[in-house]
Amino acid sequence: MVDRWAADLEPAGFWWLPAPEANPVGGLVRHIGIASVRLLYRGRGEEIPEPFRSLPPEQLRPTHEAPEAVLEEFRGNMRFVREGLAALREADLEAPRQWGSNPPVRALYIFDHICNHAQHHAGQIITTRKLWNARRAS
């Protein structure tokens, strides 16, 4: 779904901010990929590697990188997540995992959050793209 709404955007639309506190499509694409990998590591009870430790404000900011480079990073991250989820066993889903300051939760809830989180931000990408299209049409 991300490719459908983001892949053909020119750089101006990919990094456009519809409002001062809003996020650009490019930042949302990057954030979905990085956060999904981070959640996979957290759900597996593994240490999160340095490249995936950046916080959302850093991931979401406009960098004006080439859209294709950001999309390739996203695709690679999501491929890694799909492969990681496919390799899980039932015992992996039931394992207690620490998540923030909450009491431990079943890893399944963290893995489920990968989908919920990505879907939420994909909706933002769609909305931002529609706003960009409307702006360009007027």
Name what the model sees in each region.
Residues 9-12, 82:
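Short, solvent-exposed, charged loop/turn and helix-capping segments
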